[in-house]
Amino acid sequence: MQSSTTIFTRFFFSLKRWSIVFMILLLLGGGATELWAKKLRVAVLKFGTVNWELNVIEHHGFAKAEGVELEVVKLASKNATAVALQSGSVDMIVTDWVWVSRQRADGEDLTFFPYSLAVGSLMVAQGSGIRSFKDLQGKRLGIAGGPVDKSWLLICALAQKQEGIDLNASVEKVFGAPPLLNQQILSGKLDAVINFWHYIARLKAQGLKPLVTIGKAIVTLGAGSDVPMLGYVFREKWANANKGIVKGFARSSRRAKALLADSQAEWDRLRPEMKAKDDATFNALRDGYLDGIPSSWGAVERKAAKGLFAVLTKQGGKKLVGKSLKFQSGTFWPHITY
């Protein structure tokens, strides 16, 4: 039987050993956080297209290869993902950098790195005869996303710049949910529609043509470069303490994109997730995703984004960007470039 003195001595040295470990972790600072906090919780829309990329990352173990344990949290709405991030329930979501700048102006330390260039287009009905913004005057135009939808604001700015037309005053605006707007233009109840890219892809599969893409609008309005509007968004303080996790996930995202760009077999594997009813829809969705892959992200793209923010601010005002009309420093996380 061990004496109480022996037990106490062992306890003392054990406590001393763990105290040393604790002091080392304190000295490591942010590195200590990275050492233990390997899980990354990403909230996405349940049926969002980002699920395709995350599926590839998980299926091929790309995140695991970076030492990141990826947990995908599927939610019912965009607002739900934002609430999850702001409450700390998840670490990352996918949204646009205009929202990030607005949140930073309100004191939130959110930041962004790119996910996709894909945003949408202005599509016209078959046989509509619409070939210019002038032809849109007096027509019924469906708009997804509401009065301060960024695609709608960019189209308005482009119409004013190219043809001197105030679209906001000259078209009959019909705001609605993306699937409903697609149904209405296909049934002849709308003359044109502005919708998100994956809904546009489904319209292309039905033979509809774009009057203008949002990507073209961005470049024409003076950005001078394609600007990724959508990206992975997270808290700056958390990211700075967990750079290995964020940068590792970013590499796994790029790796998934590269595989999708090169492998038709990978798309065939994903097809059940894409809800494509026929080959034309499947091909349009695939091509739309691939067209949205950013090729570079550096000083040029960041500068272009700031110029685009000025255009959006002029069109949407405080209803879009919040109380500050200035693009907020730190909106783009500086530790990822390519």
Go through each PLM region and give its residues.
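Bacterial N-terminal signal peptides
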Residues: 18-30
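Pocket-lining segment of extracytoplasmic ligand-binding domains
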Residues: 97-98, 174, 179-272
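Conserved C-terminal helix/tail region of periplasmic/extracytoplasmic solute-binding proteins
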Residues: 306-338
